[in-house]
Amino acid sequence: MDDHQVLAQISSLVAEEHELREQRQAGGPDSADERARLAQLEQALDQCWDLLRQRRARKEFGQDESDAMVRPVEEVENYLQ
């Protein structure tokens, strides 16, 4: 996946996240399934942003950016900022 594909995936995930959040704010149903989907979207976004950062760092330091890999949710969710 190249940077453009990662960014397209991020845009798609963000759009879905916004749609779900807007439905909740408008008083729409707030089911366990929707909350679970929001959590999945947040995790997938964290993974995508991490992948994009990896790719950009590899490129900056002259390494092959295509060697960047999606890391497990458990790993990216526990980063200290």
Question: Language-model segments: what does each one mean?
Answer:
Residues 1-81:
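Extended, charge-rich alpha-helical interface modules
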